[in-house]
UniProtKB/Swiss-Prot annotation:
Tissues in which the UniProt entry reports expression: Widely expressed, in particular in fetal kidney, lung and liver, and in adult testis and liver. Also expressed in peripheral blood leukocytes, colon and small intestine, ovary, prostate, thymus, spleen, pancreas, kidney, lung, placenta and heart.
Pfam family, one: TNFR_c6
Membrane association type: Single-pass type I membrane protein
TNFR-Cys repeats: from-to residues: 58-97, 98-139, 140-180
Residues exposed to the Cytoplasmic side: 233-386
Domain Death: 340-366
Protein name: Tumor necrosis factor receptor superfamily member 10D
Originating organism: Homo sapiens
Amino acid sequence: MGLWGQSVPTASSARAGRYPGARTASGTRPWLLDPKILKFVVFIVAVLLPVRVDSATIPRQDEVPQQTVAPQQQRRSLKEEECPAGSHRSEYTGACNPCTEGVDYTIASNNLPSCLLCTVCKSGQTNKSSCTTTRDTVCQCEKGSFQDKNSPEMCRTCRTGCPRGMVKVSNCTPRSDIKCKNESAASSTGKTPAAEETVTTILGMLASPYHYLIIIVVLVIILAVVVVGFSCRKKFISYLKGICSGGGGGPERVHRVLFRRRSCPSRVPGAEDNARNETLSNRYLQPTQVSEQEIQGQELAELTGVTVELPEEPQRLLEQAEAEGCQRRRLLVPVNDADSADISTLLDASATLEEGHAKETIQDQLVGSEKLFYEEDEAGSATSCL
């Protein structure tokens, strides 16, 4: 009886009791509220989610190194294939472009985007070598200046000499100034010290253009002095010769008696020869005033030992006498019949001592002062008497 009082479960209710989520008598779902189940679900989600994220990022990490390795390999290949000296690598095409002669250059293999510009020499510098595609311009200081590490930007003028008590041991170069050393140290090393007056170098003397003008003026003055001195020397010699000949230097007081000595076969002249000899003697005894030009010519001839003759009547008569083969010799005889041995001995001694010029001068002086005269004897010899 009691069994009939209980309700029999139906089929629907039986199916509901088999599935989860079936409600209990109180109407709740006990498995959703269980904290153990919730923890388990959270743990599973927390573990599986990072694993999927890591698996998704692994291919991307593999791709990044591949992208970064490519530029490094490219740089390595470019370094191995550098452009040669005298060219550069184009940043657009990557090809090697040559530099321009005289404009830019490169001195070694490179991958520069452009060539280096050539250096332009500054003021005070000279171009030692021009710029090429593989070499820069080489500049150096002009002569008389230098450039060292203390003045790399400009050339400085070299010193022209050393201070007092020092001597120069090396000249100025484009890279250094003159070098000086103590005089005592230079003498101890065996080098001859320079004098104090010669400290100034030739370079310093020629630095000013006025020195050339001074040298030219000095040469002209020296040449003028030589010319004037040579001209005055001739006149001075002529004046001295006039004084020595007894004329007092004046041409109007200078008298010359020219005579010759000819050697011919001696013979006794006839009456006609005696008359001609007397005529010649009279002509020679007459003082002849000659011009200044003739006197100078005679004096110059006397200096050289040459007999000077007047190309007039005496010359013609002498030539005529020579054609007849006569011999005439003049002797100096005193006018007052004094002994002529002393005078003749003096004249012969002068001739013996090779002073023929002095002998002729003495004869001319004595004849001009009328202390002697020429006399011709019958044997054809002429005697000059005092």
